[in-house]
Amino acid sequence: MSTMIDIRRLQTVNELAREGASTVAENMSQLTGVETQMQITKINVIDVEDLGAHLGAAKQVGVSVPLKEQPYGSVLVLFDDESARRVAGTMMGGIESEGGGYSDMERSAIREVGNIMTSGFIDGWANVLGRTIDISTPQLIRASGEDIASHCVDPGEHEIAMVFDAELHAPDANVEAKIYSFPDIEAFVSMINSI
């Protein structure tokens, strides 16, 4: 099977990102009762082997979610520490973080937002692709980028990572996140080329 995307289909990747962002914003607005917008500011494709260097040594917090259906693989939503604390504070009704380690409530809030972002993003993809994409239970992660890369992604199983730089805007909090998609490349290309 070919792993080449028809150049005329690249617009579909942008459409996936836009629809995913729109669905995330709707879901966040419904959950929090606060008008939320999400914008994808940049899309990149990187080699999975370069992921550790891309993520760097700084600790990051996020959620990893395996996909049970095409395009398979997994989705990873990562926040830097400052953004993760803002997310947790917003979800907990403005309660300020005490710094240091994350409380159980903060971890739960971050897991919930990561789950909302992942499921919303994937639901947006499903809408564009005209199918369902079932996901597994989200796993909370807090580690250096290099450790995340080595524990969450198998370079032998995945060749590329699609990186979506995202900004969430709400009246009291602006948050930056990165959404990494590690699809089964053959399944992903087949889906894109079949539209």
Curated annotation (Swiss-Prot):
Record keywords, A-Z: Chemotaxis, Hydrolase
A GO molecular-function annotation:
hydrolase activity
What happens biologically when this protein's gene is inactivated, per the record?
A: Deletion causes a reduction in chemo- and phototactic ability. Mutant has a 88:12 distribution of forward and reverse swimming (distribution is 50:50 for the wild-type).
Q: Which residues cross the membrane?
A: none
Q: Name one GO biological process term.
A: chemotaxis
The question of whether Cytoplasm is a record keyword is answered with no
Q: Which InterPro entries match?
A: CheC, CheC-like_sf, CheZ_family_phosphatases
UniProt xrefs under Pfam families: CheC
Q: What does this protein do?
A: Catalyzes the dephosphorylation of CheY-P.
The similarity comment for this entry is:
Belongs to the CheC family.
Specify the protein name: Putative CheY-P phosphatase CheC1
Organism from which the protein derives? Halobacterium salinarum (strain ATCC 29341 / DSM 671 / R1)
Question: Gene encoding it?
Answer: cheC1
